[in-house]
């Protein structure tokens, strides 16, 4: 949540570059050269017109400000994730590619099951997401978050029908339930691991974990 509009809610928008640089440096201190530093870029927290009052150029500029700071700090990968609005996702991808063309851009959206198939809460289908993200310049496409690893297998299979790009899947450990005031994710490591073969069979190229998972 390092975009300027989100930070502005806390009076920190003037420190957008500083905060994003600090995040990258913290990762570098932790992992050194043993791992890639991936910059997670989520929704900016504002709605584009006509659903909200944000102009596309203003949203693009906010993403550009963030991606420029991340690139200058030496991030290895941009991971644009948990997107619901395809138009916003495309602006984020475009800003990353135009800021630093040599840095790979991974772009994932979050889908829910409906009687008509999988859609984001803004009504974007997997087919439209795959085409739109590729058109914007994403190097890798896919899905993150979601309802369960089981459903992610279905989402991955649907994505592969509509793209030849490398695919990234990062599932939550199911939907959380509250127990004694604490959010508990129901899927066990064994359950999630048991779905890996199915995800690989669906031609997923990069596997990760979302909320409720650990390294």
Predicted regions span which residues?
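Domain-level signal for soluble alpha/beta catalytic cores
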Residues: 1-215
């Amino acid at each position: 949540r390092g975009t300027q509009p989100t930070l502005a809610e806390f009076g920190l928008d003037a420190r957008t570059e500083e905060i994003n640089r600090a995040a990258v440096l913290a990762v570098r201190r932790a992992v050194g050269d043993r791992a890639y530093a991936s910059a997670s870029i989520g929704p900016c927290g504002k709605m584009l017109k006509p659903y909200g009052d944000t102009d596309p150029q203003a949203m693009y500029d906010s993403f550009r400000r963030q991606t420029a700071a991340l690139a200058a700090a030496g991030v290895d990968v941009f991971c644009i994730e948990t997107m619901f609005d395809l138009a916003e996702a495309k602006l984020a991808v475009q800003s990353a590619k135009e800021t630093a063309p040599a840095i790979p851009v991974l772009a994932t959206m979050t889908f829910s099951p409906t009687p008509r198939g999988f859609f984001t809460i803004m009504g974007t289908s997997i087919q439209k997401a795959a085409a739109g993200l590729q058109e914007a310049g994403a190097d890798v496409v896919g899905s993150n978050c979601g309802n369960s690893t089981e459903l992610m297998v279905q989402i991955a299979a649907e994505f592969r029908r509509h793209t030849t790009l490398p695919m990234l899947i990062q599932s939550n450990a199911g939907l959380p339930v509250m127990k004694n005031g604490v959010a508990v994710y129901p899927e066990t490591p064994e359950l999630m691991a048991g779905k890996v073969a199915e995800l690989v069979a669906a031609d997923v190229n990069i596997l990760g974990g979302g909320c409720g998972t650990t390294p």
